């Protein structure tokens, strides 16, 4: 037999065969398309055109306006959702270097005091807004964090309210009541009610813009009350405010000011009472920048106040960071607050929460958290600061559960009992407290909750040095205005003014600049020029008093003496038309 060739056959065909195949393929595709058209497989659905509103419709203009309003509202909701997505993306990227942080790296050392001054000015502005809220309010609600009520109290705020007058009444509001066990909530309410009226509250965590839910304190199933995102305690708080307006027979609306430290839930409280998102809220402290007025109804008006950060801690900045009074991104040293967290929390809980192996020190803990969460710098180095910010964020968000217990009071210190008895008549407290017990009983116990108990922090006070600096800055500004008006002083007065200006940085720079050789001092030149002008004018006035006759030529020369000497050389007096011709 003849062996078959191992070479591959050629794929070359004649042109007749090639065009025959192409024709058959074309006919096949044509037939398939025809069958699909008959069955209607690839037919596009017919878009029905909107006929619009007929012209004969009597309310066409009103309907068109309503459509425009709905369209604008839909666009606004889309923009708000975009902003919410951006905020969530920022939270996910927590710990990375922000744009503002990169800007500060490029700044010089001379620019750093300016940044500090801007921050101080904003804190002073918040303090002024607090004073306004206290002056305008009839009832002041101080919002406290139920996890650490004593640590989120500010005694200076309470003192300001008490000194504002006898018509100002302070009420303590224990917010975030769902984050603590039942035993701690009951003891804290008893402790605080010995000084002022205190109300328990849980803000709504729903995300829709309106119709936020409330849960009544008279619910049939108290065990299911805290499993929802609805608001709790709103009916008791409104009843408290209505009782006050009835007891004083106020015909006008009652103004309620809401004060407290940053991120205790002041804006969330207003949204929960209004049952709509009327005020911006967020987990970052300092979101509210100015006083905001919200009308709850025709009888109650709410005033939202920015959280005051002019605080003086008994310990260090780490304790203020753990109370979420400062932004985590702005902390210079985020590791030191994490050291405090490791002292308070057991290691087993942190190991199970972050799913890391056992650790020994703070650096080891942060190193393992950074490797698990993927926080790395350039070159594969572990970012310790980013891991510390993650832990701080979890602490402030409540992912690391903790609570405190109230301290024991001294037996002799019951000076506030008179205040409580007087306020009990105004607010009808017994009736309000009776309706509150149902949802407090629905809180989880210590065994069910299993949080970390930590020692209670002391109350915070204002930094008095910053308040004193504010009064000093006002006096310095007045002195600067006076020095600007007195530019014409000469000799010794000019040297004294120079000494006062040298205190500022710009004054010192100007002194060095004008002290150099071949440097023109414009201010000194202006002062000398004015001095010469005054001297010439005084001499001319003396000559006028001596001469009785008035001479127009002499008077014209006197007026020209006030001008620059450069323009007086060979200057002729235009007397044509004034004197008779000879």
From Swiss-Prot:
One of the record's GO cellular component terms: nucleolus
Localisation: Nucleus; Nucleus, Nucleolus
Region (G2): 286-290
Region (G3): 304-307
A family per Pfam: GN3L_Grn1
InterPro entries: G_CP_dom (IPR030378), Gnl3_N_dom (IPR014813), GTP-bd (IPR006073), GTP-bd_ortho_bundle_sf (IPR023179), P-loop_NTPase (IPR027417), TRAFAC_YlqF/YawG_RiboMat (IPR050755)
This protein's UniProt keywords: Coiled coil, Developmental protein, GTP-binding, Nucleotide-binding, Nucleus, Repeat
Highest taxon in the source lineage: Eukaryota
Acidic residues bias (residue ranges): 476-496
Keyword Coiled coil: yes
Motif (DARXP motif): 145-149
Tissues/organs with expression: Mostly expressed in flowers, siliques and inflorescence apex, and, to a lower extent, in stems and leaves.
Residue ranges annotated as motif Nuclear localization signal 1: 5-12
Domain comment (free text): The basic domain (B) allows nucleolar localization in the absence of GTP. The intermediate domain (I) inhibits nucleolar localization by the B domain and is required for exit from the nucleolus. Exit from the nucleolus to the nucleoplasm requires both the I and the acidic (A) domains, and may be triggered by GTP hydrolysis. In contrast to other GTP-binding proteins, this family is characterized by a circular permutation of the GTPase motifs described by a G4-G1-G3 pattern.
The protein, known as: Guanine nucleotide-binding protein-like NSN1
